């Protein structure tokens, strides 16, 4: 099917927003990576340009995790524009709360070995999106696995076999009752050398409280901020690392 789309060019180096004008410019560039197809198809989808590929994402209407949220676009943009600093090639990566799979797809296209995880009711659409966008395009075929935060972690993700270089997360903190379980999951999946890259949109006081609790277990660094979106991008590693 021939779809007319606009391909986006971008800078090779990324600059942190310094003021409102810079913030708006970078945010506009990030948001321009998405597009709506010009033809109506039987299965509606939204398009994105990352890692040199057109990515087609099917969203849902029944739950929060079935949409592509701005935090996911911010994290995808960061991974692409920081590919040298945070090299994904052959790295072991897990995404928690993968939702539609966009972040996992981009990490896979950048060369990572990816496990995309979410709740069981989201896995069908997640698998569909990942398969259609990574087959014959990626060095490593991504896996899709169920992960309910805080549930059966030792059985499904035993610490002895967790060897993740990166944990990716976008918009996993919001008004849900599982923040303690989310923190437990971050802690369980992390080893001393694991890097967490986490994009977060601040909406309510709950987000600030979670960050405070997160800091009790992890060294947290704000590496980028997008005030017009109320989104911050964090890098984190476990506290009290022997290598620190």
Curated annotation (Swiss-Prot):
S-adenosyl-L-methionine binds at residues 69, 97-99, 118, 149, 170. InterPro entries: Methyltransf_16, SAM-dependent_MTases_sf. One of its GO terms (biological process) is methylation. Residues 1-20 are annotated as: Disordered. Keywords: Methyltransferase, S-adenosyl-L-methionine, Transferase. It holds the Pfam family Methyltransf_16. Residues 9-18 have a biased composition (Basic and acidic residues). Its EC number is 2.1.1.-. One of its GO terms (molecular function) is protein methyltransferase activity. Coiled coil: none annotated. The keyword Hydrolase does not apply. It comes from the Eukaryota. Belongs to the methyltransferase superfamily. METTL21 family. Protein-lysine methyltransferase. This is Protein-lysine methyltransferase METTL21E. It comes from Mus musculus.
